[in-house]
């Protein structure tokens, strides 16, 4: 038997709609953000896969405690099923990454990853850690903790029962348990200690339940003196939802796994077993003994005196009345020493000032994609829908290139539109950063500065400088593409950098039962207008492929199908078939995959 596999190098486009739509918070949502502003505490939830996370507890931490909350999923779920489409393995991991981001957008958490690959079911954590490369994944867990700097770490799974469940599950808990003692030691994984600083969380907890005890009856009889218990069924009037309803909305984002969930209301208790660190005196408070007030920042007491009273004086009819106090707090915070919470709260203050002011900023490209180093027209909309005096003083690219330095006073409810010509500095096409380089069965490869990020940063970003009450704010916005659909109305899409041309073969595996030739169709897509293209197929030694073909693609987006005759060798053989496109002296070998659900 003779077998050919398609060798595909991917340029990936995903319709990450949630990430592209502009935020337009209501007064109630602004109030909720204000509550979060005055809490300086954080929690990191750790498990193995997308859908392993306890969305009820994550939502409770983010919306009830108002803590900065993140879920560290060691893998992207590449080994799971797919209920909604044909994508599996790496492409399923891309889908499940977006599902996790949608879940966090629902429950208020953030999302982190390691480079570990979900290679399928594993019977034992020893097998898992061998395939993953334990030290590499452990270093990623340490990196995540040092970057996020959680006060509390919560494991989803039990680290003490290897072999009793999925090896990935137990391994995630084992790595978190080990990392807790390493992150505070700058000599352990020193590279991330230099970059992000060492850090020591206050406590490590295990999110236990009756399931881990074997039955509800056994759990009722168990000694609970080592457990923290929290009531997670609370109702949030500002959001109009109970915590269980938010959790179900989040859970239902795992659509590829068929995890749609119905909302619940009423009391729901979560239990957390104390594992390491400082035991809380108040076993109903996860953050007991942790300073979560503004005094956590040097000079923060004065800031807290300005911000804490704003919850009582907040005007739901006119949130802009608190803008002067927010700006005053922003100025004071800018004058404090560089630090972890300073950066977080400056960003939150910027978002609140913009939201309370009724400012809308948007940067829209005139086309959905460009080629590397390509040019596009940027359509800017800026409007101040409140009563505060605001000036738009500068617009730059994220790298600092000035696009407009014209000072524009944003008069109340008077829209300003600008058209700016931009040349991208992006030299490579958009794709999932963990798929750019070949990894192993257990580990993806990733640039060091991107390890842990949920997705590749936006291809193009624009910085707006706003001046409010003699205070400059830098507001960063992703460049997006949008259009009007006759059915859906305003539709947003990511703005991507795509190759000039791409090729694909629909059949990823070709089987030759004998020595007879087969016809192979290659689909070529133009990434720009007026291309003269030569296409050839590279095959392993001994295989014979018909001659390269020269053809023209006139319009961007145009697709042409070309047929090649492939003849196998007489003896058994297998290898990779690779489409290669030549334009002038440049060769292209990427396949463009668009995922849109």
Cite the ranges covered by each PLM segment.
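Short, surface-exposed loop/turn segments at beta-strand-coil junctions that are enriched for proline
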Residues: 421-454, 553-556, 567-573
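Active-site beta-strand->loop->alpha-helix modules in alpha/beta enzyme cores, enriched
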Residues: 20-189, 210-211
């Amino acid at each position: 038997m003779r077998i050919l596999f398609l060798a595909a190098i991917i340029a990936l486009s995903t319709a990450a709609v949630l990430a592209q739509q502009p935020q337009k918070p209501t007064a109630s949502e602004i109030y909720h953000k204000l509550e979060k502003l005055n809490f300086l505490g954080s929690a990191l939830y750790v498990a193995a896969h997308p859908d392993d996370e306890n969305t009820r507890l994550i939502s409770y931490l983010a919306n009830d405690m108002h803590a900065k909350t993140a879920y560290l999923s060691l893998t992207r779920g590449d080994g799971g099923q797919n209920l909604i489409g044909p994508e599996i393995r790496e492409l399923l991991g891309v889908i499940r990454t977006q599902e996790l981001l949608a879940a966090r957008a629902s429950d208020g958490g953030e999302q982190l990853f390691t480079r570990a690959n979900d290679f399928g079911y594993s019977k034992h954590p020893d097998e898992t850690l061998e395939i993953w490369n334990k030290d590499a994944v452990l270093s990623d867990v340490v990196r995540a903790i040092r970057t996020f700097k959680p006060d509390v770490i919560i494991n989803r799974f039990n680290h003490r029962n290897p072999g009793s469940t999925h090896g990935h599950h137990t391994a995630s808990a084992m790595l978190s348990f080990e990392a807790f003692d390493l992150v505070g030691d700058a000599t352990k994984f020193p590279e991330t200690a230099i970059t992000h600083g060492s850090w020591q969380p206050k406590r490590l907890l295990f999110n236990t339940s009756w399931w881990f005890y074997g039955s509800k009856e056994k759990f009722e009889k168990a000694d609970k003196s080592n457990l923290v218990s929290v009531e997670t069924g609370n109702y949030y009037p500002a959001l109009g939802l109970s915590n269980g309803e938010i959790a179900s909305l989040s859970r239902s984002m795992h659509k590829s796994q068929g995890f749609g969930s119905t909302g619940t209301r009423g009391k729901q208790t979560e239990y957390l077993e104390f594992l390491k660190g400082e035991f809380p005196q108040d076993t109903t408070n996860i953050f007991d003994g942790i300073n979560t007030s503004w005094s956590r920042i040097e000079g923060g007491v004065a800031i807290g005196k300005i911000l804490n009273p704003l919850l009582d004086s907040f005007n739901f009819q006119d949130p802009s009345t608190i803008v002067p106090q927010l700006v005053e707090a922003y100025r004071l915070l800018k004058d404090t020493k560089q630090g972890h919470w300073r950066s977080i709260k400056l960003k939150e203050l910027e978002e609140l000032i913009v939201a309370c002011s009724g400012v809308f900023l948007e940067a829209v490209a005139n086309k959905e994609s460009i080629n590397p180093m390509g040019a596009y027209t940027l359509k800017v909309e800026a409007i101040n829908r409140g009563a505060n005096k605001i000036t738009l003083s500068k617009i730059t690219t994220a790298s600092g290139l000035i696009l407009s330095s014209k000072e524009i006073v944003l008069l109340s409810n008077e829209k300003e539109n600008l058209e700016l010509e931009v040349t991208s500095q992006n030299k490579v096409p958009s794709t999932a950063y963990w798929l750019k380089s070949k990894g192993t069965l257990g580990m993806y490869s990733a640039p060091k500065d991107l390890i842990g990020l949920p997705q590749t940063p936006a291809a193009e970003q624009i910085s707006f400088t706003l001046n409010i009450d003699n205070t400059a704010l830098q507001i960063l916005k992703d460049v997006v593409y949008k259009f009007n659909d006759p059915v859906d109305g305003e539709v947003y899409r990511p703005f991507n950098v795509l190759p000039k041309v791409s090729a694909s073969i629909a059949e990823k595996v070709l089987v030759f039962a004998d020595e007879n030739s087969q016809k192979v169709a290659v689909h070529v897509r133009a990434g720009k207008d007026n291309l003269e293209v030569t296409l050839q197929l590279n095959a392993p030694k001994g295989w014979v492929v018909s001659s390269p073909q020269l053809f023209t693609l006139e319009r961007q987006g145009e697709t042409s199908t070309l047929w090649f005759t492939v003849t196998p060798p007489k003896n058994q053989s297998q290898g990779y078939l690779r489409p290669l496109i030549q334009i002038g002296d440049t060769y292209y070998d990427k396949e463009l995959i668009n995922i849109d659900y």
